[in-house]
Amino acid sequence: MKINKIYSLLFLLGISIFITSCSDSLSDTTDGRLRYWISTLSSDEFEGRAPGTEGGQLTKNFISKTFQDFNLDPIDDSYFLDVPASEITLKDSSYLTLSFRGNDRKMITGDEVVFWTKQARDYRKIRDSDVVFVGYGIVAPEYNWNDYEGVDVKGKTVVILINDPGFATGKLRLFNGRSMTYYGRWTYKFEEAARQGAAAAIIVHEEEPAAYPWSVVENSWQGPQLDLQRDDLGADRVILEGWIRDSTLNDVLNFTGFNYDSLKEIALEKTFSAFPLRGLTLSSEIHNKVRYLQSHNIAAVKKGISNPDEYILFMAHWDHLGEIDSAQPSEDSIMNGAVDNATGVAAILEFAKRFSEVETDRSIMFLAVTLEESGLLGSEYFAKYPPIDLANIVAGFNYDGILPTGLTNDMVVVGYGASELEDLLENELARSGRYVNPDPNPEKGYFYRSDHISFAKRGVPVLYSDGGFDLVAGGKEAGFLIEEEYRVDAYHGVADEYDESWDLEGLNQSIDVIFNISNDLANSQQWPNWYDGNEFKSIRDASREGK
């Protein structure tokens, strides 16, 4: 134990020396700085930037030291804002069994199912819980939709389809057509199952509506699972959360008289009502190792001159997934997260440098949040317990996973059609003959899958731009190919690594555009708002009333 502590101290001392020496030789060019920050943050030395690890500590130290080098002010007395977390690791002795009238099938973890618990206890058990199919598992009064109406699922296991009904039909009158709503997110489905009193919630993975392959599920939800520390130890969550492959579910359903395709069809019927898959039960024993840790959001401010209590916010998440426990010694085990999200952190560090060199009327805040990969928890904690009045944030700009595409003719707005920030972006792009490209993949629900949503649902206007897809060299076809290859081959895997051949001109382009917009906002009296009819506008209006 003492040897391990000494090693850790020496490791962190070496980190400090490394950070100090490197920061003294920062490049004079944007491209050079971006390459340095991305390559460093995604290097093996940072161990995949998992919270609660030495690599995570190195990441936090690196970002805070960079803020310090730019003479930015901390919030209160420290750049580090506490985010108390729990880490729950499933032990190998845990199991999940699906049974049909006495015939047991012990599921193969990783290949067939992935499961965990967010209840911070050493041991949890479910015995012979009846399995109920609840369609999309949605209660949405505004869409006149309630999958749980008329059914009692207390103590039972619910099987849930991913995404929402609009995706399956493409009909705009059904939810938002192919564009995913928040009701399509896995986070919502687990939350709603808990509100309904279910003991277990299993989401069916199908690649197209999920927007990622099964490998992402394997890498994201196996190993230590992080959550915010809760006074009730997570008692308000279901006991078991998990995913099951669509093909695996289909095999299990053979005994019940249903198949996966028939369930999907039934779930779309206007008269759909949740129903038990008679004879099918779930049993599970969950053995956990529970550890409590203090993670951190890293925040810095460049104070404004005349309106220092009004803020322009730049955000990016610093965490990634760490290492794969199951990797063989000869295999690469580090999920470096170069695109996701060393690129985003590099972007806000570049904004920090630029704004450190100018004076603005309003303050500029730079926020690197933790626990994004665990469900946007760091940004949620900041927004729930804000160190500043969120109503005084003029606008937020989120950077998350910028692909190295090179120069583009466009900038993609994820969640297009939301706020007046898009008008500012369109005007700025038009000056150089470029254009705004609406989200080409609205069915993937990216707008609800990044940290800006923690601020949006509290009324703060945010812009989430995903670079561009219409490449100067190669057009849209080349841009979409880069996105598809990354999503399938690298996202949430060991292949997400920095390459010196990356063309970062597209990221540089984006930073230039957003800097111009944000600098104008920082020296104006403008208060951009959500468009009329947007779900967040009334929240913003109420928060600004009387100010």
Task: Please tell me what each predicted stretch does.
Residues M107-D111, R124, E149, G155, ...:
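Metal-dependent peptidase/peptidase-like ectodomains
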Residues A346, K353, E357, G467, ...:
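His/Asp/Glu-rich mid-to-C-terminal helical/loop segments that flank catalytic regions of hydrolases
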Residues L9-F18:
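Bacterial N-terminal signal peptides
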Residues T109-D232, R237-V238, S333-N336, P440-N441:
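Extracellular/luminal Protease-associated
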Residues G177-R178, Y182-G184, E208-P209, G322-E420, ...:
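Acidic/histidine-rich catalytic neighborhood of metal-dependent amide-processing enzymes
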Residues E47-L172, P276-R278, S295:
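Noncatalytic luminal/extracellular "stalk/propeptide" segments of secretory-pathway proteins
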Residues S99-R101, V114-G150, D232-G337, K353, ...:
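Soluble metallo-hydrolase cores and metallopeptidase-like ectodomains found primarily
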Residues C22-P74, A85, Y95, D251, ...:
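N-terminal hydrophobic or amphipathic helices/low-complexity stretches enriched
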